[in-house]
């Protein structure tokens, strides 16, 4: 079973990492090519392209200029510890054990506009490049064209290895639509399951964005801590009051609901 999540805009490169274990990203050559394209843009162009304020655009232009290989623990940080948004608050990576990180390294992947796909312990340098950014490149007008079938093929290899090892060849999509689109679902050869998280509000269950993002992180953490290897194990997710709702779930969508009475 393989889990995919989105990255985060917020980053934490100040807090020392809780583990020394680190690996190199698989798509550094591609990341370097994209950085080269971004370096050609002025702060004003970056602000327009990414809908950023002038200070944020200037910050990211400086990041592109500083970006360089090789990645080391002195100039980069493990991806699962570097991202710091709502999903990562729920995942709470700093409290994971070394064994947890080792399991996550095999079963969790982070989709990224710049790095393509990251393992939890892959070193990364700070950046801002959302997958939906219309950044022209040699392969097309946006990052979906740039990554093409690359990420789907990588996931297919991972899932085939899971199956060959006697595991469950199921991809659990905990990423946003923007990011999972880059995985080219039509090219994926394994079963895809998408968990949905709903909260009771205004007399009905609905998806509340902040809570849903946090819940994706909570489920990722649940899978890591409990070494979840199959769909039945996933249905046991019960963090922070959520519970599996079989009556509104199906083979492709697992719905988890929470109601605070």
Swiss-Prot record:
InterPro entries noted in UniProt: YaaA
Q: What biological processes does GO assign it?
A: response to hydroperoxide
Checking NCBIfam families in the record gives: PRK02101.1-1, PRK02101.1-3
Organism encoding this protein: Aromatoleum aromaticum (strain DSM 19018 / LMG 30748 / EbN1) (Azoarcus sp. (strain EbN1))
Record's Pfam families? H2O2_YaaD
Might you report a single GO cellular component term?
cytosol
In Swiss-Prot or TrEMBL terms, this protein is called: UPF0246 protein AZOSEA34360
Q: What domain of life? A: Bacteria
To which protein family does this belong? Belongs to the UPF0246 family.
Organism lineage string: Bacteria, Pseudomonadati, Pseudomonadota, Betaproteobacteria, Rhodocyclales
- Family matches, as HAMAP family: UPF0246 (MF_00652)
């Amino acid at each position: 079973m393989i889990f995919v999540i989105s990255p985060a805009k917020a980053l934490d490169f100040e807090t020392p990492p809780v583990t020394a274990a680190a690996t190199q990203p698989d798509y550094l050559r591609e990341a370097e090519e994209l950085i080269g394209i971004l370096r050609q843009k002025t702060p004003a162009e970056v602000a327009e392209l990414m809908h950023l304020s002038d200070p944020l655009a200037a910050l990211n232009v400086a990041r592109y200029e500083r970006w360089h290989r090789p990645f080391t623990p002195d100039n980069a940080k493990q991806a699962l510890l570097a991202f710091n948004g709502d999903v990562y608050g729920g995942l709470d990576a700093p409290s994971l054990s070394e064994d947890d990180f080792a399991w996550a390294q095999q079963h969790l992947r982070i989709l990224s506009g710049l790095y393509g796909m990251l393992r939890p312990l892959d070193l990364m340098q700070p950046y801002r490049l959302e997958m939906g950014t219309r950044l022209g490149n040699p392969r097309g007008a946006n990052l979906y064209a740039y990554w093409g079938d690359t990420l789907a093929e990588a996931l297919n290899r991972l899932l085939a290895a899971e199956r060959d090892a006697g595991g469950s060849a199921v991809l659990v999509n905990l990423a946003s639509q923007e990011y999972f689109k880059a995985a080219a679902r039509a090219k994926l050869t394994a079963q895809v399951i998408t968990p949905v998280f709903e909260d009771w509000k205004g007399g009905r269950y609905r998806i509340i964005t902040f809570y849903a993002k946090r819940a994706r992180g909570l489920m990722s953490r649940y899978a890591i801590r409990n070494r979840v290897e199959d769909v039945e194990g996933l249905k046991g997710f019960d963090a922070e009051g959520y519970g599996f709702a079989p009556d509104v779930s199906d083979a492709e969508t697992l719905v988890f609901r929470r109601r605070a009475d």
